Amino acid sequence: MSHLAELVASAKAAISQASDVAALDNVRVEYLGKKGHLTLQMTTLRELPPEERPAAGAVINEAKEQVQQALNARKAELESAALNARLAAETIDVSLPGRRIENGGLHPVTRTIDRIESFFGELGFTVATGPEIEDDYHNFDALNIPGHHPARADHDTFWFDTTRLLRTQTSGVQIRTMKAQQPPIRIIAPGRVYRNDYDQTHTPMFHQMEGLIVDTNISFTNLKGTLHDFLRNFFEEDLQIRFRPSYFPFTEPSAEVDVMGKNGKWLEVLGCGMVHPNVLRNVGIDPEVYSGFAFGMGMERLTMLRYGVTDLRSFFENDLRFLKQFK
């Protein structure tokens, strides 16, 4: 009992020196635990006369209460300090700009397709589609390219078997459309096509768009006027345009269309011609009554010319540094 005041003072000193909650708990066990210094003081009561024990017990309990209060106060201080330190470490500078949600953008080839569809849509063309896995009839035979025709050698075709292939052109869509409906016909046919070629200006898969008109009294003049308007609208310039005689099995006469580039050189942009009478006969349309014109162009080619891209493969490499330029 004589050491009670010293024990309380010693406990309070240890409590004030505890640097964290774990150290503080060690002090609690040392003084108030089952075998703690103040707890053991209760065992000295048996040495006192019975009439003195209640008063002595009250003094010991008062000492334990003082130490418990000191423990509680110090624990609150340590927990508050720990919370403040954590908040300081996790602080947010509200003056910093927020993380902006970046909007996506259309792929440049998609932008080109949309632009062309919009232009021809205003001229009354509808969009037609067809299968990418095609048969040799729709891809070759019906287009005046029979099995013995030398033009078949010009296509590096991906064949599945002797009759099925990945289409090399979207012209098969024209055949399917003409077989399904009678003139007047006015369609454009965008889609993916496949050829076994890969270099700076060719990829095994690329996008093509073909156009077709079949009606009475359609002439080459109609074809030239349509393509003149289209190219000047697409490039947004009053371009110098020329038509060169060419050869395609499915058109007669045929032409390739060039535009004058900024470097003063002619650049080929598309092929076109009047629908060959044999093609019309193959789909049950009388070439003595109806005529038509067709044209075809590569979407990547036009996109390269419009945006000044030098390597076609850039469109398929998914490099965001490249693609973000077109947003």
Swiss-Prot record:
User: What is a GO molecular function of this protein?
Assistant: tRNA binding
User: What Enzyme Commission number(s) appear in the record?
Assistant: 6.1.1.20
Where Mg(2+) binds, per the record, is at E252
User: Which keywords does this Swiss-Prot/TrEMBL entry list?
Assistant: Aminoacyl-tRNA synthetase, ATP-binding, Cytoplasm, Ligase, Magnesium, Metal-binding, Nucleotide-binding, Protein biosynthesis
Keyword Cell cycle tagged: no
The UniProt-reported impact of G191D is: Decreased affinity for Phe
For this chain's record, the cofactor binding note is: Binds 2 magnesium ions per tetramer.
Q: List GO BP terms, alphabetically.
A: phenylalanyl-tRNA aminoacylation
GO cellular component terms, alphabetically, are: cytoplasm; cytosol; phenylalanine-tRNA ligase complex
Do you know which InterPro entries this protein is assigned to? aa-tRNA-synth_II, aa-tRNA-synth_II/BPL/LPL, Phe-tRNA-synth_IIc_asu, Phe-tRNA_ligase_II_N, Phe_tRNA_ligase_alpha1_bac, Phenylalanyl-tRNA_Synthase, tRNA-bd_arm
Q: Which reaction does it catalyse?
A: tRNA(Phe) + L-phenylalanine + ATP = L-phenylalanyl-tRNA(Phe) + AMP + diphosphate + H(+)
A Pfam family of this chain: tRNA-synt_2d
Q: Cystine bridges: which residues?
A: none
Where in or outside the cell it occurs: the entry states: Cytoplasm
Name the cofactor(s) required for activity, per the record: Mg(2+)
- So what family is this one in? Belongs to the class-II aminoacyl-tRNA synthetase family. Phe-tRNA synthetase alpha subunit type 1 subfamily.
Q: How does it assemble?
A: Tetramer of two alpha and two beta subunits.
Tell me what this protein is called. Answer: Phenylalanine--tRNA ligase alpha subunit
Organism from which the protein derives = Escherichia coli (strain K12)
Q: What is the lineage of its organism?
A: Bacteria, Pseudomonadati, Pseudomonadota, Gammaproteobacteria, Enterobacterales
Q: Which gene encodes it?
A: pheS
